[in-house]
């Protein structure tokens, strides 16, 4: 248990940040999962509509440090390639 006021404050801040990060990571995973489901179902229209939304969620996650920049680029690249192949 934290003994000083500043240590208690850091514990509170950490708990708050952990909760925010958990929600953002969950949102990211759900969005990518929905995108992959649309691709698997070969639904070009839905995949096309979800692509910009998914990219936005990925970019925000990378910006806030939920995932690394290169991981975000890799996710976006793979999803874009699959949607492009689906549309062709």
From Swiss-Prot:
What are the recorded GO MF terms, alphabetically? small ribosomal subunit rRNA binding; structural constituent of ribosome
In which family does this protein belong, per the annotation? Belongs to the bacterial ribosomal protein bS20 family.
A biological process (GO) of this protein is: translation
Q: What do the Gene Ontology cellular component annotations say?
A: cytosol; small ribosomal subunit
Taxonomic lineage per UniProt?
A: Bacteria, Pseudomonadati, Acidobacteriota, Terriglobia, Bryobacterales
User: From which organism does this entry originate?
Assistant: Solibacter usitatus (strain Ellin6076)
Write the record's keywords in alphabetical order, separated by commas: Ribonucleoprotein, Ribosomal protein, RNA-binding, rRNA-binding
- This chain's protein is named Small ribosomal subunit protein bS20
Protein task: Binds directly to 16S ribosomal RNA.
